[in-house]
Amino acid sequence: SRKVVISPSAVERMLVTLATGRGLMLVGEPGTAKSLLSELLATAISGDAGLTIQGGASTTEDQIKYGWNYALLINHGPSTEALVPAPLYQGMRDGKIVRFEEITRTPLEVQDCLLGMLSDRVMTVPELTGEASQLYAREGFNIIATANTRDRGVNEMSAALKRRFDFETVFPVPHFLPCDNKNTAVLFPGGPRSALPAC
């Protein structure tokens, strides 16, 4: 069933962006269902919307790329067994969509760690040696990010990172059809929202 009130042409543009390997940035006012839309797109394309990064002032690069199991790291040194993959690592390894919520709330230096993954489609793991030190993204990997227009200026994205994304504005629904409450069940058995075009 249809979940989001949005122009079909906008959805088509989003799908074209993702199909061509470009990152997708959904921007708009709070409450315009950007997160739900990114979840639906990720599920439709990858069959999985669980690879999600929640942006914030305390978000670190380890939470985005990878971390370490320190017990294994101390006992055996850096290895693929000791590496703990974060959403970005998992998405590149498995060829899936990664969702980055509220990216403009994330510190600039953390945002810019996405540059190599979006342009060269490769993540370097300097702690490892040989082939394990380079993770190349499988086909299907991409990033859908969201940003609130109210957060503009909090952590403004660099020009280099902006060039890696296609921006799509998600607009609020301008108005709902007027309806007398006592007639709601008769006029719209599915509720007032059932009368609105959705996709």
Predicted regions and their residues:
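AAA+ P-loop NTPase catalytic core and its hallmark functional loops
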Residues: S1-P197
